[in-house]
Amino acid sequence: RFKKIRRLGTLPGLTSKRPRSGSDLKNPLRSVKRSQYRIRLEEKQKLRFHYGLTERQLLRYVHIAGKAKGSTGQVLLQLLEMRLDNILFRLGMASTIPGARQLVTHRHILVNGRIVDIPSYRCKPRDIITTKDKQRSKALIQNYIASSPHEELPNHLTIDSFQYKGLVNQIIDSKWIGLKINELLVVEYYSRQT
């Protein structure tokens, strides 16, 4: 993880750690001109590692976004942001996306009253996300909510931290995406691969 954030910059979904400043690194004199391919590859890797996707999963999302109406890059980010594991991370119910994925796969999370154990489940507007009634599930979520820094919640989500309940109000607006990324470079990367 640390090698990834050192190379790609801050990835809030992967870890809360921050890369050191440039003066602390071992070899600050190695400033090589980056090729266009490398820039596109780094943007793709940022997206992949932030959301914790495999290469095949990201490629599938790019194909789905390409077939949808609208800007491919914007649709791609909306698809990734509406994944259940990412929604849990954004609500503050998990400290990282891998932590949220573990909550989902261990069957602690309900969507609209039904257990969902697939982290890539695509949430829709008006979905209600809650925890199981078991004490262990509630304790896990309570610890995450208490320990997470209270950042501003995106306007497409609302949380009731006393009932351990989150609500998806609408599809995310692009300005609320918490990752500094140029999604067009990711789309370009894949368009040049085929």
From Swiss-Prot:
<protein>
    <recommendedName>
        <fullName>Small ribosomal subunit protein uS4c</fullName>
    </recommendedName>
</protein>
<comment type="function">
    <text>With S5 and S12 plays an important role in translational accuracy.</text>
</comment>
<feature type="region of interest" description="Disordered">
    <location>
        <begin position="1"/>
        <end position="29"/>
    </location>
</feature>
<dbReference type="GO" id="GO:0042274">
    <property type="term" value="P:ribosomal small subunit biogenesis"/>
</dbReference>
<dbReference type="Pfam" id="PF01479">
    <property type="entry name" value="S4"/>
</dbReference>
<keyword id="KW-0150">Chloroplast</keyword>
<dbReference type="GO" id="GO:0003735">
    <property type="term" value="F:structural constituent of ribosome"/>
</dbReference>
<keyword id="KW-0689">Ribosomal protein</keyword>
<comment type="subunit">
    <text>Part of the 30S ribosomal subunit. Contacts protein S5. The interaction surface between S4 and S5 is involved in control of translational fidelity.</text>
</comment>
<comment type="similarity">
    <text>Belongs to the universal ribosomal protein uS4 family.</text>
</comment>
<keyword id="KW-0934">Plastid</keyword>
<feature type="domain" description="S4 RNA-binding">
    <location>
        <begin position="82"/>
        <end position="143"/>
    </location>
</feature>
<dbReference type="Pfam" id="PF00163">
    <property type="entry name" value="Ribosomal_S4"/>
</dbReference>
<dbReference type="InterPro" id="IPR001912">
    <property type="entry name" value="Ribosomal_uS4_N"/>
</dbReference>
<dbReference type="InterPro" id="IPR018079">
    <property type="entry name" value="Ribosomal_uS4_CS"/>
</dbReference>
<comment type="function">
    <text>One of the primary rRNA binding proteins, it binds directly to 16S rRNA where it nucleates assembly of the body of the 30S subunit.</text>
</comment>
<dbReference type="InterPro" id="IPR022801">
    <property type="entry name" value="Ribosomal_uS4"/>
</dbReference>
<dbReference type="GO" id="GO:0006412">
    <property type="term" value="P:translation"/>
</dbReference>
<dbReference type="InterPro" id="IPR005709">
    <property type="entry name" value="Ribosomal_uS4_bac-type"/>
</dbReference>
<dbReference type="GO" id="GO:0015935">
    <property type="term" value="C:small ribosomal subunit"/>
</dbReference>
<dbReference type="GO" id="GO:0009507">
    <property type="term" value="C:chloroplast"/>
</dbReference>
<dbReference type="InterPro" id="IPR002942">
    <property type="entry name" value="S4_RNA-bd"/>
</dbReference>
<keyword id="KW-0694">RNA-binding</keyword>
<dbReference type="GO" id="GO:0019843">
    <property type="term" value="F:rRNA binding"/>
</dbReference>
<keyword id="KW-0687">Ribonucleoprotein</keyword>
<dbReference type="InterPro" id="IPR036986">
    <property type="entry name" value="S4_RNA-bd_sf"/>
</dbReference>
<keyword id="KW-0699">rRNA-binding</keyword>
